[in-house]
Amino acid sequence: MSDKNQIAARASLIEQLMSKRNFEDLGNHLTELETIYVTKEHLQETDVVRAVYRVLKNCPSVALKKKAKCLLSKWKAVYKQTHSKARNSPKLFPVRGNKEENSGPSHDPSQNETLGICSSNSLSSQDVAKLSEMIVPENRAIQLKPKEEHFGDGDPESTGKRSSELLDPTTPMRTKCIELLYAALTSSSTDQPKADLWQNFAREIEEHVFTLYSKNIKKYKTCIRSKVANLKNPRNSHLQQNLLSGTTSPREFAEMTVMEMANKELKQLRASYTESCIQEHYLPQVIDGTQTNKIKCRRCEKYNCKVTVIDRGTLFLPSWVRNSNPDEQMMTYVICNECGEQWYHSKWVCW
């Protein structure tokens, strides 16, 4: 892998670690960047300046901030040095250029100046901001069209995968989710001709789920785990059958809730639980009783009521209202047929 590829990969990894706030592994990547020879082209064609500048601004570790500041000061000197050479290059004196080439390696005073800047940490925040503004805008335009030479020689498929991973940090996670969905879809059927079909289903389902929860990665992961668990459940074989038959499209499946993905037995069980809970906590609304026109409703003052006998416990009365005498536990309960008013009176004698 060339230096440019290594720098781009390190910058992408630093961005991912900063987004996850995982500061423990940043030191290794910054140390590797110190050992790599960085040129002006590397700074312009990669995203390394923005990544290191983000470490300098957002990392809580003082040691990592010093490393980032040292790297930025070193790169600033390299950037200024290349600019000064481009301006003062002797184009009309080739003999002088040959002498310089034959003179052999010599210590450049700008390198000593760079080391001095790095050791004293005299780089101000304004200088760092200027450096990032000079280099990063050019970098953004280049990153939109990555070239194959960034990744060296290799297969076009691997090159495309690497470029997409560098551009989007969520690509490895989404690829893993597609693999999990594919494994869950093929868990019940092992037919080889359907492998491509299941692969397309897994990719479409993942795309729709990512569209729904692209702004919340936690909800995205939770939804994927729910889909995988329901697809792997042997009692939910109807989900694969509906996808194969076209009854359920991948988009509809991605939008299905946990209640909708459940099988018929589980739905009936939940309905029975709900009905039993309602019955347990349901106050008596309509009670069969004796029709009478001798009682006047206290709300509508009409004589159209029903009279019955009911236990105090049915009304969920507190213990201090109830009497310990079992003969007095029964009360006369009246329901108006006109307005629905309900009331009771414990002093009435009922036979």
Curated annotation (Swiss-Prot):
It comes from Homo sapiens (Human). One of its GO terms (biological process) is regulation of transcription by RNA polymerase II. Residues 173-289 form the TFIIS central domain. Residues 86-119, 144-169 are annotated as: Disordered. Gene3D superfamilies: 2.20.25.10, Conserved domain common to transcription factors TFIIS, elongin A, CRSP70, Transcription elongation factor S-II, central domain. This is Transcription elongation factor A N-terminal and central domain-containing protein. The lineage of its organism: Eukaryota, Metazoa, Chordata, Craniata, Vertebrata. Residues 145-165 have a biased composition (Basic and acidic residues). SMART domains: TFS2M (SM00510). It holds the Pfam family TFIIS_M. GO terms for cellular component: nucleus. Residues 103-119 have a biased composition (Polar residues). InterPro entries: TF_IIS-typ, TFIIS/LEDGF_dom_sf, TFIIS_cen_dom, TFIIS_cen_dom_sf, TFIIS_N. The gene is TCEANC.
